[in-house]
Swiss-Prot record:
It comes from Clostridium botulinum (strain Langeland / NCTC 10281 / Type F). One of its GO terms (biological process) is translation. One of its GO terms (cellular component) is cytoplasm. It comes from the Bacteria. Pfam families: Ribosomal_L21p. This protein binds to 23S rRNA in the presence of protein L20. GO terms for molecular function: rRNA binding; structural constituent of ribosome. PANTHER family: 50S RIBOSOMAL PROTEIN L21, LARGE RIBOSOMAL SUBUNIT PROTEIN BL21M. Part of the 50S ribosomal subunit. Contacts protein L20. The keyword Ubl conjugation does not apply. Keywords: Ribonucleoprotein, Ribosomal protein, RNA-binding, rRNA-binding. This is Large ribosomal subunit protein bL21.
Length: 104
């Protein structure tokens, strides 16, 4: 069984046991979160349930494995011949989750 869920403005195709990195969730490590924005559920018998826009009564349960920050991305702007240089770094926060159960 698999599902397509929406979290952090992005869509993820998930199955039970998958580990993925999503945009930061406000949850503690080793706690469980419920993702109830489910767009699609594919069952083992080949049946697919598509939501309009969400599947009614479907939710995905996941365990929070870690909270962290991604590698630094360096943004460097400059204007030639004008002595203008600007260096900026950004580290995007993320949450590492493991999918435990898909309820549909």
């Amino acid at each position: 069984m698999y599902a397509v869920v929406v979290t952090g403005g992005k869509q993820y195709k998930v199955a039970e046991g998958d580990v993925l990195f999503v945009e930061k969730l406000t949850a503690d490590v080793d706690s469980t979160v419920e993702l109830d924005n489910v767009l699609l559920v594919g069952k083992d018998n080949g049946e697919t349930v598509v939501g309009k826009p969400m599947v009614e009564g479907a939710k995905v349960t996941a365990k929070v494995l870690a909270q962290g920050k991604a590698k630094k991305v360096v943004v460097f702007k400059y204007k030639p011949k004008k002595d203008y240089r600007k260096k900026q770094g950004h580290r995007q926060p993320y949450t590492k989750i493991q999918i435990e159960k898909i309820n549909a």
